[in-house]
Each structure stands twice: as structure tokens, then as C-alpha cells.
């Protein structure tokens, strides 16, 4: 082995040791703060996104009791990630799918992604299975749906309807919000009109938001006979063309 190869091997080994040492500090809430900050700075200046970004993402996995220090460190990690630009997107997306702590990863993606990429990311992180017994997954679905309402969804509306059956009322409500923020389509109305007819206590908020949407946008009731049977909401009457109108 030549001298230059030995030097390169020594430098690579030293760099690997530095990565491992600093990575331990980044995600250790009990580390000396100066050591953790120095570790964040180390990865912020690292040129390889496949080394720097996964390490910096770990800083979002815990919070410090001292809110100011916590915010500063997370902002520093945030800036260290977004400086890699588009190269950061697939790495952060993979992390987002695996974690239940999504606030900062979503902020990163919102900064770097186009609206279409943001929609694709959010839809790709939803869990469409029954997660009613998993509080972390339930909360994650709720948070993602709350973000998704600001974007045009790409999945078939029928797939979003899965969340209308969720046990958690927050999930049902957030799914309705996503659907009513989409451009008007009969398929959307067909999915949510059931809540216009639903006066049950567990769906009070959903009934109200759907009613407000029908009134605001003058949507036609698709099944007026069912609404009459269930009871036209107090203070409104149903016109002959199927539009709910406030009583004067």
C-alpha cells in the first residue's frame, strides 16, 4: 500500500469517527448543549447529503425543556437540511413515512417541494388501514389530513372516503375538510352529503361544516327526499331545485 493510499485511508477513518461521534450528540437530549450544538454545526457543514441530512433529522425527534434553545437547535438543523435543495427531498420523504413526529419534516418539504410534490408526499404518508388502536398513527393521519386540505388531492376521492369511516371524529372531520376544499365535483358531494342527513351527537361538527358548505356554495342536494325525511335543518328550507336557503 502506497503512502498516499495510507493517508487517504487515515483521513477516511478519521472522518468516519467524527461522523459517529457527532451523530451520538445530535440525537442525545442529555448531551452537553455545547457538544450537541457543535455536532449540529458539523453536519450543517458536511457536504454529503446522505450523511448530513439523516443525522440532522434526528434532532427533530425530541424537545428540550428550555424552549428557546430547542427552537434554535431545530432551526439550525432545518437550515442545514434545506441548503441541500432538491437532494434533500427523497431523504426527508423517507424519514417522514417512518416517523410520527412530522412537523419539522413537513416544514422542510414545504420549503423545497412544488405543490404537486407536496400533495404526493402527503398522500404517500397517509395510512389507509385501520389505525384506531394506534394513537401515534392516528395522530399522524390527522396532522397530514390537516395539511392536505390546502392542496388539490391526486388520489381518487373514494380512497379519501376511507377516513370518513374512522372511529376518531377528528379524522372524519379532517377528511371532510380535505374534500370540501377540492374543486366542486358531484363525486365529492356524494361522499359528504351523508353528514348533511346525520344529526347524531358524534357527528355534530361534521353536520355543521357540511351544512355551511352547502349554504356558502349553493350546492344542490343530491338526494332531497332523504333530507326531507331526515329533517331539513332548522332555519332553512329546501328549494324546488334542491338548494338549501336560509329562511328570511
Question: Language model features by range: what are they?
Answer:
Residues 2-14, 33-48, 68-86, 94, ...:
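Structural detector for internal amphipathic alpha-helices that build alpha-solenoid repeat scaffolds
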Amino acid at each position: 500500500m502506497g503512502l498516499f493510499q495510507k493517508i487517504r485511508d487515515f483521513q477516511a477513518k478519521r472522518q468516519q469517527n467524527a461522523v459517529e461521534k457527532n451523530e451520538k450528540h445530535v440525537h442525545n437530549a442529555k448531551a452537553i448543549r455545547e457538544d450537541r450544538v457543535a455536532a449540529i454545526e458539523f453536519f450543517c457543514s458536511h457536504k454529503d447529503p446522505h450523511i448530513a441530512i439523516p443525522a440532522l433529522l434526528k434532532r427533530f425527534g425530541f424537545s428540550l425543556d428550555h424552549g428557546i434553545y430547542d427552537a434554535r437547535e431545530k432551526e439550525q438543523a432545518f437550515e442545514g437540511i434545506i441548503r441541500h435543495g432538491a437532494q434533500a427531498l427523497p431523504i426527508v420523504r423517507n424519514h417522514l413515512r417512518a416517523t410520527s413526529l412530522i412537523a419539522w419534516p413537513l416544514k422542510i418539504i414545504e420549503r423545497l417541494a412544488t405543490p404537486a410534490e407536496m400533495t404526493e408526499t402527503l398522500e404517500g404518508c397517509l395510512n389507509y388501514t385501520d389505525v384506531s388502536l394506534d394513537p401515534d398513527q392516528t395522530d399522524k393521519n390527522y396532522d397530514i389530513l390537516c395539511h392536505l386540505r390546502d392542496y388539490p388531492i391526486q388520489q381518487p376521492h373514494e380512497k379519501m372516503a376511507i377516513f370518513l369511516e374512522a372511529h376518531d371524529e377528528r379524522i372524519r372531520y379532517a377528511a371532510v375538510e380535505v374534500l370540501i376544499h377540492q374543486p366542486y365535483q358531484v363525486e365529492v358531494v356524494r361522499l359528504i352529503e351523508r353528514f348533511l342527513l346525520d344529526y347524531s351527537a358524534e357527528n355534530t361538527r361534521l353536520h355543521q361544516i357540511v351544512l355551511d358548505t352547502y349554504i356558502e356554495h349553493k350546492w344542490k342536494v343530491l338526494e332531497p327526499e332523504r333530507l326531507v325525511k331526515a329533517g331539513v335543518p332548522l332555519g332553512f328550507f329546501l328549494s324546488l331545485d334542491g338548494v338549501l336557503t336560509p329562511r328570511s
